[in-house]
Amino acid sequence: EDVRSLLGFSSTRFTWRVSGVSFQIMGLGNGLGLCQYGARGMALLGFPVDEILKFYFTGVELKQLEKPTYLKPLIGKTIVLDPGHGGDSGGSGPMGLSEGYVNLEIARALAALIIKDGGNVVLTRDKNEYVSLSERVRISNENKPDITISIQQNIFPDDQVGGTESFYYPGDIEGKKISEYIHRELVTALPLSDLEVKQADLFILRETNNPSVMVKVACLSNPQEERLLSEPEFRQKVAKSIISGIEAYYHD
């Protein structure tokens, strides 16, 4: 009578039967992965994806990946910056400006812009010290970056020679594209002669396992260009030109 009243049946003559029984059993398994049949069964029972994964993999947490946006175009990208020379390595200009110092200051300014764009940055050196070429390559390859950018200056016997040039390794298709984008921004923004984009069999370009470019920003041996390189505003303009080239490459 209680059942009839609870279910609202008008008749006292009714029967019932069990239509099905469901068991959830954790198998013996080797615990190395997901069972597609078990996972499908849980899905049919209405379990959400994160609960199914947690059932098979301890400590798993689903997170929504960030995607590049107009304001953060480098999200998910890692870029290795290689400030050339350092320590007693490298030359200096007529006024005594050290190439290692200039390269590091430009790299630091560029690193800040990359981070602002949402990217990750690895520096092959972050102070005025000597780092061997093989160590620079090791740092780059170990971090598996999307791009490696080596920042250097030219020093020529003739102090009247000046300009900016960029290099990529022969056959590095993406390296060529990146160097062209960066170089275009540099020659557009800076009051320097265009020494063009060139192929070069340079150690840092050859031995890195990712698209790599070398930017020779200016000629430190040229007194006028040394003066420019000594100015923080000019170095910031260089960094902005390089980041603009990187952004253009990823927007293409």
Regions from the language model: what does each represent?
Residues 29, 42, 93, 126, ...:
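Short, flexible active-site loop motifs that bind/organize anionic cofactors or intermediates
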Residues 77-96:
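Short glycine-rich His-centered loop
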Residues 28-29, 86, 220:
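Short, glycine-/Ser/Thr-/acidic-enriched flexible segments
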